[in-house]
Amino acid sequence: MKKNDYFIDVSGWQSPDLTPYIEESGTDKTIIKVTESTYFLNNYAQSQADTSNPVGYYHFARFGGNINQAEMEAIYFLNNLPSKNVHYLVLDYEEDASSDVQANTSAILHFMDIIALHGYQPIYYSYKPYTLQNVDIAQVTAKYPNSLWIGAYADYAVRPTPDGIWDFFPTMDHVRWWQFTSTAIMGCLDKSIVLLDDDFDTTPQPLSTITNETTSKDEKENETMKICMRSHSGKQGYIAIVDGRKIPIADIGTVATLKKIGFDEISVHDKDFDNIAQAYSK
């Protein structure tokens, strides 16, 4: 998406066929709710994806500050995505925060890390006051710059654009999208404006194959890897290899999560670890 593009976000409250909403809102771009906690699935999600141009999917979080619950919710989300590929997966964090800001932040980052390790671009959605009260958002944006989608409404009048209400923009660093209304059309519909161009150029392609940069072209075409790698000494920690990128893993719990979803854990000599790691871009 480009700056000043619009998109709508929808859930099971909308119909399976999004054509009427697209025609009335003026955009076919959507972000679709797929799951909530580990108990709710939007049964319309696939149909909604099929009748629109989805740019992302979202999960409504209930994990608060519980990192283990965050992990289970991330896996549940990933296991129930519609078949249409997207770049963005969104964490909707607007209820059930604990009183421990650091616990909330750590759980959020754990969820986003799992999303990133699957090759998607994680996005954090919420409201500014709720975020500032419950989350150390600087930690989130330090790891995932420009990853914020913030909702803030001037009123509940029908507003197809944010013209005339920019004074209500939730001034924060790293805001990629602004959800400026929940009433883009009569009868309620969330609509957002894009503030930053997408920072990728390729067709959406979530993690399915991971190619080794050191292999030949023919080998790259046939080889698939899903690995968490550590050195024999353990001094270098763990890394995951995702879409030709190496991603440091700070939490051993992330390794356990990746193993649950099919990643192989390998251990190599320290020198080999360094050589392999250098073969991948960050």
Protein language model features and the residues they cover:
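Polar/charged alpha-helical tracts
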Residues: 16-20, 24, 79, 138, ...
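Short, surface-exposed polybasic-aromatic patches that bind anionic ligands, especially phosphate groups
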Residues: 216-282
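Short acidic/glycine-rich loop or secondary-structure boundary segments that cap or lie
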Residues: 67, 132-134, 248-253
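Conserved beta-strand termini and adjacent loop/short-helix elements that scaffold enzyme active sites
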Residues: 60, 125-127, 180, 230, ...
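Substrate-binding cleft of extracellular glycoside hydrolase catalytic domains
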Residues: 2-121
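Functionally critical loop-and-helix segments that line ligand-binding/catalytic clefts
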Residues: 1-14, 19-24, 141-220
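Catalytic domains of cell-wall/extracellular-matrix polysaccharide-remodeling enzymes
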Residues: 87-165
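Ordered hydrophobic segments in well-structured contexts
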Residues: 7-9, 29-33, 56-58, 90, ...
